[in-house]
Amino acid sequence: AIAATMVMGAFASTSTIAAGNNGTARFYGTIEDSPCSIVPDDHKLEVDMGDIGSGILKNNGTSTPKAFQIHLQDCVFDTQTTMTTTFTGNASSTNSGNYYTIYNTDTGAAFNNVSLAIGDAQGTSYKSGAGIEQKIVNDTATNKGKAKQTLDFKAWLVGAADAPDLGNFEANTTFQITYL
């Protein structure tokens, strides 16, 4: 019995330790000359416009505007009082180029008779390259801009006289924020 216990004890003490896992972690970003940082998830915004019936877009109709935001953090303002956000993208040939081209996600072709409008929170649309100005929200105690700011926008589809193409769509723009 003593020998059996010694043998079992030997097996227990020589049990192997499972090998660990190894990997790497990459940390990246950009340091910019700016009073604020864009919240990381807002660098690549995705705005789901939903399913839009073609009937609302006929005869120069518009879809229901979809609100979206860009969030800023770690803001330190000196004398700045406004932020201007400029969206740029391909101007649509529909509606005299006042809006953005939308593309069929299956074929890559531009949609006919419909385009994307981007505007301020009140629903005023802005052409590609035109700045949308918003006031910096101040902290009442310091009378300086708050460390967190939210930029509010809306996007909607604008039809033409004729019926729009049908299918899944996307429009891609870039945006830049300047501080004055």
Language-model-detected regions and their locations in the chain:
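Gram-negative bacterial Sec-dependent N-terminal signal peptides
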Residues: 1-18
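Mature extracellular/passenger domains of Gram-negative fimbrial/pilin and adhesin proteins
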Residues: 14-180
